[in-house]
Design a protein with these regions (language model features):
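Residue-level recognition of alpha-helix initiation/capping sites
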Residues: 1-7, 49-50, 74, 157
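Residues on a specific face of well-ordered alpha-helices
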Residues: 11-16, 20, 24, 42, ...
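A structural signal for small-residue-enriched, beta-sheet-centric alpha/beta enzyme cores
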Residues: 22-23, 52, 67-72
């Protein structure tokens, strides 16, 4: 119990780290229409079969405050869960988000799942998108993930150690994607 990390303990000043690339729903939609290359299919399978084993190690690290897995509600939905539960605002940097190969191109070709739209309807009122975020990009942000990565809220001084651990464990897409501020909801810049 001393090492349990919930999705409701993010603190103002924390940085946000994502462990896996995004876009599994987009890739799955393309696969169903036989429009996903063999190389991209291999990446999709590798991502969905990579277990989130570092979660137990991260939970033991001082300065890691909150963890959640990004799954069916997409990145925005799970960021909203952290914001709501922690009574903070989550700010995400769209340019920093790690997309799996060709996901933006596939999404622009219309490979957005119906679940993505339903996700937006469920929580969109709590999300503030920059004017530069297109409807397609919004669909990518709400894209449901199968076996998605972990969204981690940690102190800035701990972030380099978190990223080193993740990269050593084979989480090549792991990167910082935003931070936690005072307020409420989720903002994408």
């Amino acid at each position: 119990p001393a090492h349990v990390r919930k999705n409701a303990a993010a603190q103002v000043g924390d940085v946000l780290i994502l462990t896996k690339g995004l876009g599994i729903g987009v890739m799955s939609a393309a696969f169903k229409k036989q429009q996903l290359s063999q190389a991209d299919y291999a990446v999709m399978i590798q991502s969905t079969t990579q277990l989130n084993r570092p979660g137990s190690l991260l939970a033991k690290m001082d300065g890691v405050h909150a963890l959640t897995d990004v799954t069916g509600f997409g990145l925005l939905g799970h960021a909203w869960e952290i914001a709501r539960g922690s009574k903070v605002k989550i700010e995400l940097d769209f340019a920093a988000l790690p997309w799996l190969p060709n996901v933006p191109e596939l999404a622009s070709q219309g490979f957005i799942t119906g679940a993505s739209g339903r996700n937006w309807q469920a929580y969109g009122e709590h999300i503030q998108l920059a004017e530069t975020v297109t409807a397609t990009q919004r669909g990518m942000l709400t894209d449901p993930q199968t076996s998605g990565g972990l969204l981690i809220s940690c102190r800035p001084d701990v972030a380099p150690s978190v990223l080193t651990l993740l990269h050593e464990q084979g989480f090549d897409y792991a990167c910082q994607i935003g931070h936690v501020t005072a307020g409420s909801g989720v903002q994408v810049k």
